[in-house]
Amino acid sequence: MASVVGDDCNLDVMPPRKKKNKGSNKMQDKLNSNNNTGSKKSRKRKLNSNVNTVACKSQKRKLKKLEEDKEKEILFSKTAELLDKYKISEDVSSLLQSSKVIGRSATKLEKRRRAMQLSKAGVETEHSDESVEQNDNDDDSCMDEPTTPEHVEIETPTFVTDSEQQLVHADLMISAEESSSKLEVDDTVDMIPLTTCRDDDEDSMDGLIENEDVTVQGPRVPAFVVHVSRPAEVEETRKDLPIVMMEQEIMEAINRHPAVIISGQTGCGKTTQVPQFLYEAGFGSKQFSSRSGIIGITQPRRVAVLATAKRVAFELGVRLGKEVGFQVRYDKKIGENSSIKFMTDGILLREIQNDFLLRRYSVIILDEAHERSLNTDILIGMLTRVIKIRQEYYEEQQKSLQSGGTVTSECQITPLKLILMSATLRVEDFVSGKRLFPNIPPLIEVPTRQYPVTIHFSKKTEIVDYIGEAYKKVMSIHKKLPQGGILVFVTGQREVDYLCEKLRKSSKELVVQAAKRDAYVKKKCDDGSFGGVDMKEIAEAFDDDSNNQNSRFSSHGEDPSDIGDGNYDDDFEEEDMYESDEDRDWETVDDGFASSFVEEGKLDALRAAFNALADKNGSVSAEPAKSIAAENQEAEQVKNKFSPGKLRVLPLYAMLSPAAQLRVFEEVEKEERLVVVATNVAETSLTIPGIKYVVDTGRVKVKNYDSKTGMESYEVDWISQASASQRAGRAGRTGPGHCYRLYSSAVFSNIFEESSLPEIMKVPVDGVILLMKSMNIPKVENFPFPTPPEPSAIREAERCLKALEALDSNGGLTPLGKAMSHYPMSPRHSRMLLTVIQMLKETRNYSRANLILGYAVAAVAALSLPNPLIMEFEGEKKNESKDADKTVKQEDKQRKKDRKEKIKAARDRFSNPSSDALTVAYALHSFEVSENGMGFCEANGLHLKTMDEMSKLKDQLLRLVFNCCKPSETEDSFSWTHGTIQDVEKSWRITTSTSSKTPLLQNEEELLGEAICAGWADRVARKTRATEYQACAVQEPVFLHRWSSLINSAPELLVYSELLLTNRPYMHGATRVRPEWLVKHAKSLCVFSAPLKDPKPYYSSEEDRVLCWVVPSFGPHNWELPAHSVAITEDRDRAAAFGCALLQGEVLTCLKSFRALLAGKPETLLEREAWGLERVGSLVMVLTEKKIDTLESLRKNWEQNPNVLYSEIEVWFQKKFRHRVKDLWQTMLKEAHVRRS
């Protein structure tokens, strides 16, 4: 060390030496030469001190490492001694059996062999040969029949102290007291888990000491095991699943904690295996009371529910619909005694609304929690409270039982287990602030079985033409890299269709060029050249640069100029996709003859020629020359591996039909390469086999919602880092893969968010608020959401519900709001449906009521789903390159033109000038009555998938009308009384006549339009010019879409279901409304003027009340609507108006013939100045005191005293006619149907 730090030492600390580059490092030499003498001394002192410090730290690390090694050796030796001390003998170990035989019936030979082994070991057997022979018949029958789940009671893992150790194995039990010595446990080990299969030892375990650090729900009870007989192929497959190796760890965490979080990447097996772990542990078994509840598993998508339910049933060897069932929106298959139930999160949310404690369940698994769907977030918040409440109820019941009380089986409550499972779980959202869980649940991370995926970032990020860059990268992969499927992520259907069309065209051109080159090569071969290659051209190519030869025959056929300097340790390095114009232009083909050979893969003759030239020039190869046949065989292998063949390009997006989606799973021919162009639906929903390369554009189309204006917009935005990881993982499902990201690492690190926003932050929460209110949660802002919505969104939702009359002015739930909460749909749609039921209930004995209800349900389904009418030619700009128009062939243009004319004809066929919703409802009716639904959609330009889903939704809503709104559950005014569900379906199935395209009458269409107005009363627009409107919610003008059915009529007032911003704000789902509908169904949005004197107040015999006229102003823009009649609020004004109507004969018609006998005009009662007159003032005063302002109130007063108002009305007659009042009075009492006592 002294020699290193001596005074004469000029020490210089330098970084590690890099690889030698071309040229000298002039900058470093210049810096070294500029060092002066004065700085050397100070630097020397500084370096000396640094070296001493480094040496001291290094010695400490070495000493510390030596000490740690010694401690490990001591611990290892102690462990070995302890194991040797209690090692069982070989005679005893031979009696041990594998755990796989548990639950399997032994044969006669196996039982005798087992008895002989026990006898040799000196262990007495309980059963003799005779007992074995007696059970032979049973054993044989068990072998012939399929094995059913078997229940075996064992004790749960208990924890044993030093003084009570036991060694237990199946039929052989050796107590610690009989052992040669007593087990000594190290101080670092607190407990040892113990499992036994003997019922005789239960009493001996009661006194064992429990660990205080372990959270246990309730007292320790016997466990329950369900033995499963799986198919052989399932057992083989399960061995490769990482989560199977962690079964014990997972089940221990579930048994000890009320909530558990399991995190594992896609493919680890958590979705299918965790329910099986619980099933085998006794959950869902009716024979084990504390775990008899169903195992419930939620998925955010219906397709995942069906797939996982079928897979789990197959792996357990049971029938789907018996032990394992499922329930989705349109389908249900579950038995009464099912143990496992798969369902969507919306199904469980409806169940928790009816039974908050979820008494039917013992375990709830929320899968795909990282997606943060709206329903899943609500369920997490509710279930955390359910866990606590059920635990408290359980403890109370246990105390009651210990004190001698009794609890019926129906009222028995057991603890509930909650399991959150996710691929990329943001744990901080669930455990931060202890808002959800007072005690942080354990997090179990499951390793993945994913193959390694090499990530390639682009050096530059293309902002505009990223579709063009994706096309170039796909073609580059196809031409240069080995076989393997390519998955391309784009944003929407338009981009998918455009890129697919462009790739198919390029694939055809490659095939044509290959055919031409094959013909050219064949012609050269016929000329007698060496192996079909001109030796002169080969010699010139060889003499140009010998390095190019190595480049051409590199192991992967890539140009070295394309290799980047990224640090990647896989076979393929990061590629620079932007280096040369030659690489950017995929249409360019090399002119050189040898280049055409390389592109075609004709390497046999070319390599032989190069070998011959190399030998001629003295570059003798170390290996002997290969035969021509061997060279041809090797060249053929290279050709088959790297030659660019035909591309099989397939689209994949959500609106694609199921049959078209399944095409991506079909096998690809040997000479083809699969290319799937998909939206983000391929991130998690589907796993496409054979994908080796992923091209990620880094974009996604998101739907943004502005809670203040209610305007929605589709925008192309960057994906999150979590989504990027999901996309890259698609390349590593079947083998090592590569992901080419068309953006730089700087963009990924600095611009991409860590994860996407939860759905609750991006959608309206009016349905959430209504659900909370219906479950007696008045203050929604205090609910424990994992991510609470914005306060402004909550206020906007409450304003919307008040406009829909679901909430009163104080925020309380109205009877209408309670009925709306029973429907699993948006509050707007349920308001519309209930309005139809209310109005038809008021119209009694209407023969066509069932038909109107059928169309009402169809209109609700139409407004709930995207428009099924295909709009391919909206005029919106496609995201395509500049030469897109040049690439479209003339026949394609003509085909699109014909398609456009067909769609326009379909619009005219179904178009209803009053409502877009009724237009779609008519199309749905025609679709269902047609014999060929697929042909109908093809002929009329309709989306088959949307129409099919709309038909299913209509049927479900119709069942809800008859099941949800029963008189015992809701107000009787919301129940259907005009017929049964069969009557509605029969009326709906009628076919329209040729003279009319719709069976509905005009008044019936107006009734449905009024119901739509009730559901969207706060989304009103008023016409300003042509198709331009002013909406209530926004200041800027909005427009009717040119595909709307109302585009030609353009009514003065309309409501819309959606305001979508593209190049301008367009209204979708528009319906014409009348001004009186707004006042009737949206009074909270109206401001009324003072009662008008002209027209004067009047009495309505239909409503039996007096009304006055006012001028309403609607919405924030104060639109003045036509005069509207409302009830009079002032008591004296109301009494005076009723008295005027009574004298005019409007209340009792018998007075009309006596109007000429009156001494004054009845209208004077309406003038406050005339109330000073005796006959006017006395009548108004009595009417006010007696609260007589309706015919009903007048009748009740006359039944008590028939002479009420007699004197006050008599003075209104002229004196010479007052003698006729007595007879008139008897007629008035008779007409009022006064029942005299």
Curated annotation (Swiss-Prot):
Gene3D superfamilies according to UniProt: 1.20.120.1080, P-loop containing nucleotide triphosphate hydrolases
Keyword Transport belongs to the record: no
Lineage of producing organism: Eukaryota, Viridiplantae, Streptophyta, Embryophyta, Tracheophyta
Highest taxon listed in the record's lineage: Eukaryota
Any one Gene Ontology molecular-function term assigned to this protein's record: ATP hydrolysis activity
Annotated InterPro entries: DEAD-box_helicase_OB_fold, DEAD/DEAH_box_helicase_dom, DHX37-like_C, DNA/RNA_helicase_DEAH_CS, HA2_WH, Helicase-assoc_dom, Helicase_ATP-bd, Helicase_C-like
Helicase C-terminal domain mapped to chain residues: 605-776
Protein name: ATP-dependent RNA helicase DEAH13
